[in-house]
Regions:
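Hydrophobic pocket/interface hotspot
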Residues: 18-22, 124, 158
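A conserved amphipathic terminal alpha-helix motif
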Residues: 87, 136-165
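General secondary-structure propensity
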Residues: 2-9, 68-69, 73, 113
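Beta-strand/loop substructures that line and gate deep hydrophobic ligand-binding cavities in soluble
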Residues: 52-55, 84, 92-144
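Glycine-rich portal/gate segments that line the openings of hydrophobic small-molecule binding cavities
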Residues: 42-96
Length: 165
């Protein structure tokens, strides 16, 4: 059984400006530098006419992991994320996937960015699946909680980025 991830954030900026803060190359590099963790890197960035695709790596030091994770996984975690965005109607829709080093499973999500005037909303809706007998469900819950915390930190970064520009 998968654990759900739901996150919504609202910004006081128009759609185009918010999209650049969420998915623009400069904003992504700055976000990774500030909150990406160990060995964070933008691995690929490919604009495509009406959207963009990018892949990034983020590290989580073992000393920052919950004890439940440390008992199942030795060492630091490396998370690789891939995000695609495509213009859709009056906004953008996308998909996100992520894998965690040494953990058999995946994180998948659908994303949307919609705007009305100077108000834009970002929605992430996804799930975590871990294929480890007996403890997979517990690990899914921990990962879903950590992903939600990461999305909250990213939302704070985007809001700050928007106010500083």
């Amino acid at each position: 059984m998968a654990s759900r991830i739901e996150h919504r954030s609202a910004y006081s900026a128009n759609l185009a400006t918010t999209f650049e803060a969420v998915a623009g190359e400069a904003a992504l590099r700055a976000r990774l530098e500030q909150i990406g963790g160990d060995d964070a890197e933008l691995l690929e960035y490919a604009p495509a006419g009406d959207g963009v695709r990018y892949k990034l790596r983020q590290g989580i030091s073992s000393d920052k992991l919950p004890s439940a994770v440390r008992t199942l996984h030795r060492g630091d975690l490396i998370v690789e994320r891939e995000q695609t965005w495509k213009a859709a109607g009056a906004g953008y829709t996308g998909t996100a996937t992520a894998s965690v080093s040494g953990v058999p499973g995946e994180i998948t999500a659908k994303t949307s960015l919609t705007g009305e005037g100077e108000r834009t909303t970002l929605v992430n809706s996804g799930e975590v699946k871990v294929r480890i007998p007996f403890v997979g469900g517990k690990l899914e819950n921990v990962i879903a909680e950590q992903v939600t915390k990461l999305l909250e930190r990213e939302a704070e970064f985007v809001a700050k980025w928007l106010t500083e520009r």
